[in-house]
Amino acid sequence: MAASDSSSAGSSTESMLQESRRFPPPAEFAKDAHVTSIEQYEQMHRRSVEDPESFWAEVAEGFHWFEPWTKVLDWNLPDAKWFVDGKTNLAYNCLDRQIDAGLGDQTAIVWEAESPGSDGQFVVEHWSYADLHREVCKFANVLKAQGVKKGDVVTIYMGMIPQLAIAMLACARIGAPHSIIFGGFSASAIRDRVEDGQSRIVVTCDGSYRRAKIVPLKDNVDEALTMTDRVDTVIVYERTKHDGVNYIDGRDHKWDALMADASADCDAEQLDSEDLAFILYTSGSTGKPKGIMHTTGGYMVYAAMTAKLTFDLNADDPNEMYWCTADIGWITGHSYIIYGLLPNRVPTLMYEGAPNEPGPDRFWDMVERHQVTKFYTAPTAIRAFMKWGDEHVEKHDLSSLKVLGTVGEPINPEAWVWYHEKIGGSKCPIVDTWWQTETGGHMLTPLPGATTTTPGSCCRPMLGIDAAVVNSDGEEVPNNTGGILVVRKPWPSMLRGIYGDRQRFVETYWEKVPGMYCPADGARVDPDGNFWITGRIDDVIVVAGHNLGTMEIESALVSHPDVAEAAVVGFPHDVKGTGIAAFVITQGQAPSPGSDAAEAMKKSMSAHVAKELGPISKPDQIRLTEALPKTRSGKIMRRLLRDIAAGNPITQDTTTLEDRSIVEKLQASG
Ligand code: WT7
């Protein structure tokens, strides 16, 4: 529910981090971009928020509609209907449109397996629009033959293989909303989602590969299905073909066997613009996961438009090769591996495995071999690459790269600059994209040909997005004053609800600041009009009457030469009310706890923060640690850190932790 430190949510957060570096778009890049200057962006943005209906109508006209809409928007807060009465199909716009235009032979997906083939070369597959279309139609017929009808929720739990894309597009083709579960989740997560989504069918794999080991996906499904009797059908794609996989007669079917007899003719269902396209569960920091609902027309239009603008995609550039390193099990993968990319007719690279398999240079080796032009990853990955060492990057020619993207959490300026210099060769614009599972697509981001970027800022609102930083009464706060980020107008890919929980939808997003969408992030706007995310509003800490964004302190810490990564939380403090606790991963081996070297290092880190941000931001506790408690999606579990910092017993659920042993280590770290 609402922020635990909600006392601070409405008042102003003081922003102390000053960043003066500016990176204008390279002229060479800007001249051919979709949006070529900040003036052009500003003029387009103004028009898009002043007259949204004509703006969105124009964007939506670039897609195939079986029947046109009668009204662009029907808005009854918090319920939006976009492109009312319009009939369309996501899979049709991804595949058939390219084929109809005579371009079916072009590459839609390039897939690379984690392990090499028997010849020692990495296994790469090129899937054209026509190839995908054929398999998608066949699998759509398989689903129908298994009794799946329009509106039935299909659970998908697979590794990062082309068949995952095929399964999701097949669902989209027949109007069966998919509910994709990240392949790193366990049996109980499957059970919860199957139950919540009332899904009777699961599509999975026997196993998937991760760091050359087999993740037993089918075993996990089997275990989940001992805990619910909702599922009567399981379809299994055999990826690993390992021994011991159990098949239950009547319930379990092999993908290949079903596909062998399936027809490749399957008309795309003419779906209503507001038909449910998918459910995707997002954890929220407490309670049971929320099934975020996205619908067909609005999501399609927004995902594809934002992909095109943010990455400046160009279908007519034969060298274009886009790579997003996320897993399709997250919204980033839904929107920016599949649904935003295929309608733009740009090849999307899909990688099966881990970034350090077989070595820490895997990503850079792939960028070089595939001549990747647009690359999209997360700050946590960037910091890992920094820690692994520049030599793994320097081995490779990365000169094909043109735009670099980041998403998922605030990027600290040190990581931003490293990404810019080491990966981008100081020539690639960086797009720091702020958005959420709930928003469906990018909300705040630079446009690479238009925006002068500054490290750590996600810059400007996307076209059509009316974002602002306000106090809890919804009034805009002055520049450089922290407040609550809100979106004041509806946009096409906004969530339509939480599956089965109307009240939670209304309370979570629409009641914190009445009349506005509230994503629960704190932010400020600098005098140039650039947005800075200061962290979740429940991460804001109030120290001696000053409100501080934890992210700013983390950034200051990470700019210390001995710090690789830092997480900052508040803890009860006798004098200040709230003290600042910092959990720090050091560069290289940490000095042993309690040693003079450790104490000296902590002192130097404290002094550094005081120098960067002012003494008020100086941590009261620093704990040197070798790891931070993270969920499998890479988010730091801050509530857990708060309990550790306060010396409280751990009562919360730690089952989503990537490595559970780390809790004891942190408690011992003192
Ligand atoms: C939360 C949403 C959107 C796909 C990945 C995460 C944080 C996301 C940024 C960014 C600062 C960011 C926010 C947001 N976040 N991108 N560029 N800068 N913070 O999706 O799991 O729905 O999480 O991630 O706190 O609310 P998600």
How would you name each of these model-derived features?
Residues 181-206, 221, 368, 375, ...:
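AMP-binding/adenylate-forming catalytic core of the ANL superfamily
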Residues 169, 173-257, 371, 378-379:
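Structural core segment of the AMP-binding/adenylate-forming
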Residues 107, 234-236, 247-281, 288, ...:
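Conserved pre-ATP/AMP-binding loop-to-beta segment of ANL
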Residues 300-321, 331-373, 387-388:
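Conserved AMP-binding/adenylation subdomain of ANL enzymes
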Residues 460-464, 475-509, 548-550, 648-650:
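Conserved ATP/PPi-binding loop(s) of AMP-dependent carboxylate-activating enzymes
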Residues 91, 109-169, 186-191, 251-257, ...:
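Conserved AMP-binding/adenylate-forming core of the ANL superfamily
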Residues 122-130, 269-270, 277-301:
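Conserved AMP-binding A3 loop
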Residues 339, 343, 373-377, 386-453, ...:
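Gly/Ser/Thr-rich phosphate-binding loop
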